[in-house]
A protein has these predicted regions:
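Clamp-loader machinery-focused feature within the broader ASCE/P-loop NTPase space
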Residues: 1-127
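Charged, glycine-rich active-site and insertion segments that engage polyanionic ligands
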Residues: 1-50, 71, 141-142, 151-205
Length: 205
């Protein structure tokens, strides 16, 4: 997993996250809204890693070396929970109750926060959203919930109103090209083709 310094674009979101971490002014619930490939999971993972870091830098950046960071990088940090679902196109009320509501009452194992990352949050059924809403309305002080979605409008207005909304914008073409040429070592003419195809979405490049 990279650091915030390695993320291409999204500087306003990174600045906001870093300031929140530095000031210890973290909300209980966030929505990261952006199209597929825009970097929602990367930002959520880096945010979670920074919150749990045991030796965080002054700018809010995770150290990447402590036990918590190493666990986060390998996907084994016990207080960073990735919510999954068995059915391909829906997150059921049982998924939310089992993985979030019933688990969130247990205090963090080794960290200050207990963080739940819900990818494809727009796949939650109405029942699942209502179940989650109760937790968002009265969360434990250590809880942080991150909803990742391509369509925030699919979430209940009552959920949206209780979350901090972070919208991932398209990245400038020159930043995409610079990354492709410098980091991926793609030649100029190929980078231009990739940039045209990406349309500001690093995941498509």
């Amino acid at each position: 997993m990279s650091s915030f310094k390695d993320v291409v674009g999204h500087k306003n979101i990174i600045k906001y996250i870093s300031s929140a971490v530095q000031a210890d002014a973290v909300s209980h619930a966030y929505i990261l809204n952006g199209e597929r490939g825009s970097g929602k999971r990367l930002l959520a993972n880096l945010f979670a890693m920074s919150l749990q870091c045991q030796n965080r830098a002054e700018d809010g950046e995770a150290c990447g070396k402590c036990q918590s960071c190493k666990q986060a990088q390998s996907g084994n940090q016990p207080d960073i929970i990735k919510v999954t679902h068995e059915k391909p196109n829906t997150i059921s009320v049982d998924d939310i109750r089992t993985q979030v509501n019933n688990d969130i009452v247990i205090k963090p194992y080794s960290s200050k926060y207990k963080i739940y990352i819900i990818p494809e949050a727009d796949l939650m059924s109405a029942q699942a959203q209502n179940a989650l809403l109760k937790t968002i309305e009265e969360p434990p002080e250590y809880a942080v919930i991150m909803l990742l979605t391509e369509n925030a409008e699919a979430l209940l207005p009552t959920i949206r109103s209780r979350c901090v909304m972070m919208k991932l914008r398209n990245i400038k073409d020159q930043l995409v090209k610079k990354y492709l040429m410098e980091q991926m070592e793609i030649p100029d003419y190929k980078a231009d083709v990739c940039v045209a195809f990406a349309q500001g979405n690093m995941g498509k490049a």
